[in-house]
From Swiss-Prot:
UniProt source species: Leishmania infantum
Lineage: Eukaryota, Discoba, Euglenozoa, Kinetoplastea, Metakinetoplastina
Transmembrane portions of the chain: none
Keywords: Repeat, Ribonucleoprotein, Ribosomal protein, WD repeat
Name used for this protein in its record: Small ribosomal subunit protein RACK1
Superkingdom assignment: Eukaryota
Gene Ontology cellular component annotations, sorted alphabetically: ribonucleoprotein complex; ribosome
Record bears the keyword tRNA processing: no
Family that this chain belongs to: Belongs to the WD repeat G protein beta family. Ribosomal protein RACK1 subfamily.
InterPro entries recorded: G-protein_beta_WD-40_rep (IPR020472), RACK1-like (IPR045223), WD40/YVTN_repeat-like_dom_sf (IPR015943), WD40_repeat_CS (IPR019775), WD40_repeat_dom_sf (IPR036322), WD40_rpt (IPR001680)
């Protein structure tokens, strides 16, 4: 993979990244930061080298009064959700950068938020240990309380299935839980981590779940059975994991490294470091919809951009 350049505009750690799923979107990526803002980024038409900015801010989304911890993009519309330590979720129109709606019910910092695959539901979680399901009008429809997590819920995502909607959550209680959205029932609890879980993600086909956390282990699970398929020890606390949308690859961001693994061989196929520099810790990652570009967010306030070469 090749280093293409950076995006510069945040004044704090880049905490979360998300890429549009619509083909041909002029927005390349949306980022959130500890500076209390989110930014939607467009291509830089005047870029001539990796030393110039890879992209330019399209809109800066301002309004939160605390760190912004997570962003999720609608699959078929130009809307984004942001979660914040100010205990709120906001919905934004990316066409004009305006806040359209606030979601207020969490009693502590909100750490994670996600759109459902059909964009009709929203799920959120945070330091009050409660997972909440909302409609897009801002009404809280369900709270997952029975068999819930016993500590902060740090990460949450939907499976891509519309027929059997599932939510997966990761927590500081060292577990992952799989939830039926319609009934709010915990279908299974996945145990395998020896310390808190910081990230969970579901594969594009909905068959696999990957989790990572403080113990430095990336675990791969069969989502339908809850079976742990294998473990990759990266020997450093894991900040985020992301499946490639079109290759059997998994990117893992840790305190020490940013690596891409081939899931068949379980081998590292790329260690991502810009030429001549050792970047600061990577805490967020996102693949473009076509799988040809990877964005990484860092503690030095920069977003770095990587491309896949033709040989890969």
């Amino acid at each position: 993979m090749n280093y293409e350049g950076h995006l510069k505009g945040h004044r704090g750690w880049v905490t979360s990244l998300a890429c549009p799923q619509q083909a041909g979107s002029y927005i390349k990526v949306v980022s959130t930061s500890r500076d209390g803002t989110a930014i939607s980024w467009k291509a830089n038409p005047d870029r001539h080298s990796v030393d110039s900015d890879y992209g330019l801010p399209s809109h800066r989304l301002e309004g939160h009064t605390g760190f912004v911890s997570c962003v999720s993009l609608a699959h078929a519309t130009d809307y984004a959700l942001t979660a914040s330590w100010d205990r709120s979720i906001r919905m934004w129109d990316l066409r004009n950068g305006q806040c359209q709606r606030k979601f207020l019910k969490h009693t502590k910092d909100v750490l994670a938020v996600a759109f459902s695959p059909d964009d009709r539901l929203i799920v959120s979680a945070g330091r009050d240990n409660v997972i909440r399901v909302w409609n897009v009008a801002g009404e809280c429809m369900h709270e997952f309380l029975r068999d819930g997590h016993e500590d902060w819920v740090s990460s949450i995502c939907f499976s891509p299935s519309l027929e059997h909607p599932i939510v997966v959550s990761g927590s500081w209680d060292n577990t992952i839980k799989v939830w039926n959205v319609n009934g709010g029932k915990c279908e299974r609890t996945l145990k395998g981590h020896s310390n808190y879980v910081s990230t969970v993600t579901v594969s594009p086909d909905g068959s696999l779940c990957a989790s990572g956390g403080k113990d430095g282990a990336a675990l791969l699970w069969d989502l339908s059975t809850g079976e742990q398929l294998f473990k990759i020890n990266v020997e450093s606390p894991i900040n985020q994991i992301a499946f490639s949308p079109n290759r059997f690859w998994m990117c893992v961001a840790t305190e020490r490294s940013l690596s891409v693994y081939d899931l068949e061989s379980k081998a590292v196929i790329a260690e991502l470091t810009p030429d001549g520099a050792k970047p600061s810790e990577c805490i967020s990652i996102a693949w473009s919809a076509d799988g040809n570009t990877l964005y990484s967010g860092h503690k030095d306030n920069l977003i770095r951009v990587w491309s896949i070469s033709d040989a890969e």
